[in-house]
């Protein structure tokens, strides 16, 4: 089976796509996956680093661009559809999965017009504009939150959760090593989160009596690392401050409480790894979807949410202290998080995709082609 994964822009779209791709290629040596994205998106660097080929098209968003910007970006759409058609004709995928983001629209619509089975994977509680539009034509809509189902026809919805990377799955399967001091993990996504970084530093004076009793790992992003490190040391803390955490599996395994944003991929990781959390939703997220995401964990008893407008150093310190000082509460939160986890999401989504392929092509392995057969000529980036 050859799968095409279309979309990206942010890690929230890209990483679930990579997790699904990892599942597909491990099933059979003849399976392969190709991605389609844009040169400006995170996928342009992350997908090749994960070992998958990627094609690039030229397309930009329409939402929030103003009338002039939207009209200008509309002019790019015919070219994006032509590029999509060329890529699809060259790679001949058996199924196309849109993961959200600008690139998914032209590719999935063109695949539908070519009678290739299509699906979308919606990571958030509020479906993005592209996925809502594509939901009218695709065969399946994979959702992670019950709230997202209302955007799609009931017969198309598979609520299976968000796929997470295989390295995180290894952490899920690995027993946690015992450690003495409570451990706090702070991060704001792959680029850090400036407001979150600042509030954590403001919280430190209110946690001064704990500085000998807790260990802190803090991913800051490049912009704030030096300032944050100085802030910790000024308050007598000796944390592990990093611009970027390469091995999130180890970071999750070694912590008792997480302070972070409420992106869908992050929440999928927290629940599979069974970690209590304090969630600070990104206020500029489209349709305020991070607040909706966070509420699902809060309502289940797995997390505490502090909206950024209410976030002060004192408030954050109080929540950190109350959770770290209550092992029984942490354990209850961890169990609640685990009940929300979907460790089999990638496997179950791949199962449905293979069934779509079987219905269309008569075999779960798709169209007849030689094993490993690639396009007859090298792909032309953004041609």
UniProtKB/Swiss-Prot annotation:
Recorded metabolic or biological pathway in which this protein acts: Cell wall biogenesis; peptidoglycan biosynthesis
Cellular localization per UniProt: Cell inner membrane
Function: Cell wall formation. Catalyzes the transfer of a GlcNAc subunit on undecaprenyl-pyrophosphoryl-MurNAc-pentapeptide (lipid intermediate I) to form undecaprenyl-pyrophosphoryl-MurNAc-(pentapeptide)GlcNAc (lipid intermediate II).
PANTHER family (UniProt xref): GLYCOSYLTRANSFERASE (PTHR21015:SF22), UDP-N-ACETYLGLUCOSAMINE--N-ACETYLMURAMYL-(PENTAPEPTIDE) PYROPHOSPHORYL-UNDECAPRENOL N-ACETYLGLUCOSAMINE TRANSFERASE 1 (PTHR21015)
GO terms for cellular component: plasma membrane
Binding site for UDP-N-acetyl-alpha-D-glucosamine: 10-12, 124, 165, 190, 245, 290
Gene3D superfamilies: Glycogen Phosphorylase B
Protein name, as recorded: UDP-N-acetylglucosamine--N-acetylmuramyl-(pentapeptide) pyrophosphoryl-undecaprenol N-acetylglucosamine transferase
Molecular function as annotated in GO: UDP-N-acetyl-D-glucosamine:N-acetylmuramoyl-L-alanyl-D-glutamyl-meso-2,6-diaminopimelyl-D-alanyl-D-alanine-diphosphoundecaprenol 4-beta-N-acetylglucosaminlytransferase activity; undecaprenyldiphospho-muramoylpentapeptide beta-N-acetylglucosaminyltransferase activity
Reaction(s) catalysed by this chain's protein: di-trans,octa-cis-undecaprenyl diphospho-N-acetyl-alpha-D-muramoyl-L-alanyl-D-glutamyl-meso-2,6-diaminopimeloyl-D-alanyl-D-alanine + UDP-N-acetyl-alpha-D-glucosamine = di-trans,octa-cis-undecaprenyl diphospho-[N-acetyl-alpha-D-glucosaminyl-(1->4)]-N-acetyl-alpha-D-muramoyl-L-alanyl-D-glutamyl-meso-2,6-diaminopimeloyl-D-alanyl-D-alanine + UDP + H(+)
TM stretches of this protein: none
Domain of life from the UniProt record: Bacteria
Gene Ontology biological-process entries: carbohydrate metabolic process; cell division; cell wall organization; lipid glycosylation; peptidoglycan biosynthetic process; regulation of cell shape
Family label: Belongs to the glycosyltransferase 28 family. MurG subfamily.
